[in-house]
């Protein structure tokens, strides 16, 4: 069985033909249309059409609140033109084939559960650190979608009750690569729009630049506190960290150290006795995670997997 797989991001659409063994062919990417949903549908059809005779359908991972049963997207996230529309039905009508949809963060979590860093886990979580914070929650060995398909939408988690109205006090704004770079610009006295990316930041941090290391420590504490909260709420065995910066050993090493420090800072409290610590690991899949997860979601839907 071969499937046309789309990983729809805010800036690009990654695509490939993938089989049940995760073998990928004809992989590539194109810019994501920013103007209209009609342009978006035209783009998907143009990518699908050359492969229509060799694939059984389309599997998609995309941003937003995605009802995987009906294909309805109640909130399009980075692609607001999808908000309130039957994306699954629209793609199916345009391409003339079966279509399955999954939220991008949940797709990444499904990939890690089925074939990555979370194989065999009963309770676990995935944090995808990027422009925002995505991911998914695993409970009792199953991906948790929630009654409204919004489980695991970490970006909306409030980080400061005293500033509830300030949307800057959410995980999206505190624990994202976007915020890491913004803190670094501010620490260096650079303009808020100064060109900067994660690789440049970690080049500075790995070189021992004091300002970069100071910002990294602050950032890791913001993330570690949320990992701690997950530990308390869900008793997770592992938290897998994904996103481009997760490839940096310095990030994972610093995050583990800061996370352990949270427990040590309350070490003399009798109420901390027996509170478990989770294992922080890097995601196994990187840029292919959403495609792999979209494929697994498709295979579950058509009954090809247990």
Model-derived segments and spans:
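Glycine-rich phosphate-binding loop of actin/hexokinase-like ATP-binding domains
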Residues: 119-174
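Active-site glycine-centered loops adjacent to acidic/histidine catalytic or metal-binding residues
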Residues: 104, 130, 294
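Hydrophobic "anchor" residues
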Residues: 23-24, 73, 143-144
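Short beta-strand segments
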Residues: 7, 59-63, 126-132
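ATP-binding/phosphotransfer module of carbohydrate and carboxylate kinases, centering on a glycine-rich
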Residues: 1-57, 68-70, 91-97, 114-120, ...
């Amino acid at each position: 069985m071969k499937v046309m797989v789309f990983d729809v991001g805010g800036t690009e659409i990654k695509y490939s033909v993938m089989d049940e063994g995760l073998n990928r062919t004809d992989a590539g990417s194109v810019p994501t249309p920013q103007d209209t949903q009609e342009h978006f549908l035209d783009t998907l059809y143009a990518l699908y059409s050359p492969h229509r005779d060799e694939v059984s359908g389309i599997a998609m991972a995309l941003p937003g609140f995605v009802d995987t049963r009906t294909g309805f997207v109640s909130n399009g996230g980075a692609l607001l033109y999808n908000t309130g529309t039957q994306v699954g039905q629209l793609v199916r009508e345009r391409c003339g084939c079966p279509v399955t949809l999954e939220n991008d963060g949940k797709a990444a979590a499904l990939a890690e559960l089925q074939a990555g860093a979370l194989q065999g886990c009963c309770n676990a979580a995935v944090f995808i650190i990027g422009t925002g914070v995505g991911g998914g929650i695993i409970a009792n060995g199953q991906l948790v979608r929630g009654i409204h398909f919004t489980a695991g939408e970490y970006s909306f988690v409030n980080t400061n009750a005293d500033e509830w109205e300030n949307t800057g006090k959410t995980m999206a704004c505190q624990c994202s690569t976007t915020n890491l770079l913004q803190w670094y610009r501010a620490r260096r006295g650079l303009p808020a729009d100064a060109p900067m990316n994660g690789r440049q930041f970690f080049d500075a941090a790995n070189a021992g630049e004091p300002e970069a290391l100071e910002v990294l420590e602050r950032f890791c504490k913001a993330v570690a506190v949320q990992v701690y909260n997950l530990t308390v709420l869900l008793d997770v065995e592992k938290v897998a960290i994904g996103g481009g910066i997760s490839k940096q050993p310095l990030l994972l090493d610093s995050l583990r150290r800061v996370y352990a420090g949270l427990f040590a800072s309350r070490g003399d409290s009798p109420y901390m006795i027996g509170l478990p610590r989770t294992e922080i690991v890097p995601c196994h899949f990187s840029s292919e995670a959403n495609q792999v997860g979209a494929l697994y979601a498709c295979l579950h839907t058509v009954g090809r997997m247990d």
